[in-house]
Amino acid sequence: MESEKTYLQNLILNRKVVRNYIESDKTFPALKEIPKLTIKIPTAGFSRGIEIISITSKTNINKLAYFANEESYLKKGFGKWISNSKAIFLILINQEAYHERYEKMDKQNETNSTSWSVPYWYVDAGAAMMNCMLLIDETGLKSGFLGSHNMAISEIKSLLKIPENIEILGFVTAGVEDTTNRNNKQKTSQKKLIHEEIYEK
């Protein structure tokens, strides 16, 4: 007999990335708690190089939608997303915090942060992103993610006074899903992702 799923298991199993929101006047006070819980993550050497900015001002949300090229998204026939968000959370990466930490005396025998084959600042940023998305889903809203590769980064940094040396991983969005505008995603062939003992194709 299959055991009953835990709360966390159900949350993970039912979460999905949503990129079409509707406008809503409903308030979600729990959104205020998300930033401090998002960065409650392990960071390499306790570098604490992952930061977050929360945006709930409608004016700033609209500006971020513009800088994220939402207009081109709408022209392709998709519904509104960024501009209809109830909140946007920017995951920020401070690489210098990692380098400073690994120059300390207690890390002298560790692999230097400039030599990591997979930089831990990206590992830690991914952990923060997942925290944020699950916390959003827990409020009853739907989470989405937009990477920073197609954004006007300089303009965003200027708007939010983000220092030049800080990287923006992307936007984690929170909003009310537009269930009338669901796009049927084409099913892809299932690839084996879980392996036991050895890697098998």
Residue ranges and their predicted role:
Residues 1-92, 197-201:
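N-terminal amphipathic, basic helical "cap/leader" segment at the start of enzyme domains
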Residues 38-39, 89, 109-158:
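Small-aliphatic-rich amphipathic alpha-helix that forms the alpha element of a beta-alpha
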Residues 71, 107-108, 162-164:
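Short, hinge-like loop/turn segments at secondary-structure boundaries
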Residues 75, 79-88, 160-184:
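A glycine-rich helix N-cap at a beta->alpha junction
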Residues 93-97:
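Short glycine-enriched loops at secondary-structure junctions
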Residues 100-108:
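Short, flexible, mixed-charge acidic loops at enzyme active sites
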Residues 183-201:
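Phosphate/diphosphate-binding glycine-rich loops and adjacent basic-rich segments that engage nucleotide
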